[in-house]
């Protein structure tokens, strides 16, 4: 290992007399360092402010932000999207989703109760990813502080209003859990996508020779 050599800086001359102290003070006060600091201060003073007055003002959130869930309805009809498959309950790593269903007269599952314990939820978004009907999605409401547990996780709090769904007052959800508009372009190719099928000319060259050519080889 190479030996490191350290360069020693010259020691600062000691100031003894009052005249030397005065000169050192003037040099330090009127040096370039002072003007550099003043220039930076003036620049920041006239720069636009980035401070917002929360909660009256809020910064825009990403559409794929993961916060309190939303239960979606079908547009126009207003029916609930959830079919009671229970995939969100099974994949939940924090075990905070609880679904109680029963079989209706049409042999379809009917939802009796759907609760989410927001006190245990880690907002990972797995429930939104696994939902086949885009029934549960991640919203952007992060202000959910409360003094009572009973205010956490009621279905009426998550579910989109039926009137808004019938009037189509809200667009189709494009946040976390939904398919991106340009997902085909962003989809990564698999190794099998690079395998090219052989052309007709290559397949003819690789095909086995005819029986007559084998007979000719045997006679030779």
From Swiss-Prot:
InterPro entries: 4Fe4S_Fe-S-bd (IPR017896), 4Fe4S_Fe_S_CS (IPR017900), NADH_quinone_OxRdtase_chainI (IPR010226). [4Fe-4S] cluster 2 binds at residues 92, 121, 124, 127. It is a peripheral membrane protein. Its cofactor is [4Fe-4S] cluster. Residues 187-220 are annotated as: Disordered. One of its GO terms (cellular component) is plasma membrane. Binds 2 [4Fe-4S] clusters per subunit. PROSITE patterns: 4FE4S_FER_1, 4FE4S_FER_2. Keywords: 4Fe-4S, Cell inner membrane, Cell membrane, Iron, Iron-sulfur, Membrane, Metal-binding, NAD, Quinone, Repeat, Translocase, Ubiquinone. Belongs to the complex I 23 kDa subunit family. NDH-1 is composed of 14 different subunits. Subunits NuoA, H, J, K, L, M, N constitute the membrane sector of the complex. This is NADH-quinone oxidoreductase subunit I. The gene is nuoI.
